[in-house]
Regions:
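Rossmann-like NAD(P)-binding element
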Residues: 48-55, 66-107
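NAD(P)+-binding Rossmann beta1-loop-alpha1 motif at the extreme N-terminus of oxidoreductases
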Residues: 2-63
Length: 107
């Protein structure tokens, strides 16, 4: 795992971070995307469905603004810049340090 210091870690400055692919842009995937991006990680949020990515982009922006309004976050634009939305799985998995699976549970 190749980790680099982004110097923009918004949670704990100076902590090394890396890049992560999150597979699944539903509620849980969006939550993980926010957690990783706020910690300074570069995030690739993947979903097979392009409309799910459109919803994710809007919902993440809304959630970041909500955190700011409650005094629980800052710099939502900077955090959004760390999240890239990807509909190609191979591209999402290229050059990442970690993969977080957040797909639907179909039993």
């Amino acid at each position: 795992m190749n980790k680099t210091d982004t110097s923009q870690n918004l949670v704990e400055p100076g902590i090394s971070s890396g890049s992560v692919a999150i597979v699944g842009a539903g509620l849980i995937g969006r939550g993980w995307a926010i957690v990783f991006a706020r910690a300074g990680w570069k995030v690739k949020l993947y979903d097979l469905h392009v409309d799910a990515l459109d919803v994710a982009k809007k919902e993440i922006a809304n959630q970041l603004q909500m955190l700011v309004s409650h005094g629980l976050g800052s710099q939502p634009d900077l955090i959004m810049q760390k999240i890239h939305f990807e509909s190609d799985l191979a591209a999402a998995l290229t050059d990442v340090d970690y993969v977080q699976e957040c797909g639907p549970e179909v039993l």
